Design a protein with these regions (language model features):
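A short, exposed loop/beta-hairpin motif centered on an aromatic-Gly-Thr core
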Residues: 14-23
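Short, conserved charged micro-motifs
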Residues: 26-30
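Solvent-exposed, well-ordered amphipathic alpha-helical segments
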Residues: 2-4, 24, 62, 98
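A broad, low-specificity signal marking well-ordered, structured residues that form hydrophobic/aromatic
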Residues: 8, 20, 58
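Short aromatic-glycine-(Arg/Gly/Cys) micro-motifs in beta-strand/loop hairpins
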Residues: 2-15
Length: 98
């Protein structure tokens, strides 16, 4: 049996935040347990508030049609993150002090 990738949504404390592709739920759900993801989400902010803190609840579900569209638009525009994630929200700009 051949599976086609499905688009999934990661919710943080009930808010749809990221969309990404995975073949099956088990594969999609693994992202919730990745330390690098929690670190990245803790560094990204909205209105100067981190997206994710230590006690944030992360949940995976199938993406809704509007979220699928946003993911596909980001993929077509080559605006996915290095990890092939599409943010579904507007983030604060990343400031670099180099």
């Amino acid at each position: 049996m051949i599976f086609a990738p499905t688009i999934w949504t990661l919710e943080i404390d009930g808010k749809p935040t990221l969309a990404f592709e995975a073949l099956k739920y088990r594969e999609a759900d693994e992202i919730r347990h990745q330390e690098w993801l929690r670190l990245e989400l803790g560094q990204r902010k909205i209105n100067h508030v981190p997206l994710c803190v230590a006690d944030s609840r992360l949940r995976i579900r199938l993406a809704r049609p509007a979220e699928m569209l946003l993911y596909r638009q980001a993929a077509e525009a080559n605006k996915l993150s290095d990890n092939h994630l599409a943010y579904l929200i507007e983030l604060d700009p990343v400031v670099s002090f180099r």
